Amino acid sequence: MSQRPNTPQRDRPTEYRLSLSSNASSRRSSLGNNGRDQHASNQTMIEKYVLPQLQELSDSMVTLDGNMTHMNFIHESIADLNEALSALLYGLMCNSWCVDFPNISHDTPHELKLIQRLEELKQERQALQAKLKPKELTKGSILPLSRQPLSRGSQMLYRDENVPGSTASSNVNIDINDDEDNTAASFVSNPTTFKPQMISSVGASTDFMGKQTVGSASSKLRRRSILHQIRNNAAIGTIPNTLTGITPGERKRSLAVSAKRIPILAGSSTTAGSASSANRESTNTEPALPNRVVRTRQRTYNPKNLASRPPFR
């Protein structure tokens, strides 16, 4: 027959152990009842010192339990906020990486240095342009002596000092705009027998820019009537240097000036008579050909002498 193992002996048949889940009032009542039975002498000390402290400890544990519960709620709320806030910050960071904001300067000193350098380069460029501009003007303005323009009215004539065969005339005043300002002169005039060329020596020359100007100066002159040309060329006492090769016989007097007496030169009649006789001989006689009779032509009019002409015309 087997025997039961020995069990430890208990001092009291019933032993009360405190549990965390037990009620405080039941613990106090059980302790009080047990204390009255066993420790009657110490009842006053327990009720006076131990029980109030235990009651305070129990109340503190209840308060701690409530505080921990609230702290758990706060922790959960902070965790949720942390996740949302971290997601927001991550999104903003990704947006700043992917999108370029031109108005936000990332490196302010470097940007300021670049702006200052650009301003210095701009000022240096303006200074160089200001230095080069007078040189370009001097290159374009300096011309050879034969190509220096002479301002006469609104037109530009050139010097012919270096051109062989040309003579420079002094005190030559040609007012080309006189035809537009002066209305006192007559509008009837005898035409000339030549074509006046204002600029003949520079017809086929090279300008200072290297371009060939064949008659460019004369072609740019405004086309004028015969009256204007005669009044500007033949009615002036002095002849321009470009018209020195014209004989007085080729020029005809203009009616725009006042009436003058034509002087009868001594050799004019003799020269005219000899010229007319030579002309008659050349026209009336024809070269003799074989088997052909030479006949003389007879004129039906008598040539008049210069003395029979009126003194004015």
From Swiss-Prot:
InterPro entries: DASH_Dam1. Residues 110-139 form a coiled coil. Residues 17-35, 268-278 have a biased composition (Low complexity). Pfam families: DASH_Dam1. Signal peptide: none annotated. Keywords: Cell cycle, Cell division, Centromere, Chromosome, Chromosome partition, Coiled coil, Cytoplasm, Cytoskeleton, Kinetochore, Microtubule, Mitosis, Nucleus. GO terms for biological process: attachment of spindle microtubules to kinetochore; cell division; mitotic sister chromatid biorientation; protein transport along microtubule to mitotic spindle pole body. Residues 1-39, 268-313 are annotated as: Disordered. GO terms for cellular component: cytoplasm; DASH complex; mitotic spindle polar microtubule; mitotic spindle pole body. It is found in: Nucleus; Cytoplasm, Cytoskeleton, Spindle; Chromosome, Centromere, Kinetochore. Component of the DASH complex consisting of ASK1, DAD1, DAD2, DAD3, DAD4, DAM1, DUO1, HSK3, SPC19 and SPC34, with a stoichiometry of one copy of each subunit per complex. Multiple DASH complexes oligomerize to form a ring that encircles spindle microtubules and organizes the rod-like NDC80 complexes of the outer kinetochore. DASH complex oligomerization strengthens microtubule attachments. Within the complex, DAM1 and DUO1 may form the microtubule connections. On cytoplasmic microtubules, DASH complexes appear to form patches instead of rings. Belongs to the DASH complex DAM1 family. Component of the DASH complex that connects microtubules with kinetochores and couples microtubule depolymerisation to chromosome movement; it is involved in retrieving kinetochores to the spindle poles before their re-orientation on the spindle in early mitosis and allows microtubule depolymerization to pull chromosomes apart and resist detachment during anaphase. PANTHER family: DASH COMPLEX SUBUNIT DAM1. This is DASH complex subunit DAM1. It comes from Kluyveromyces lactis (strain ATCC 8585 / CBS 2359 / DSM 70799 / NBRC 1267 / NRRL Y-1140 / WM37) (Yeast). The lineage of its organism: Eukaryota, Fungi, Dikarya, Ascomycota, Saccharomycotina.
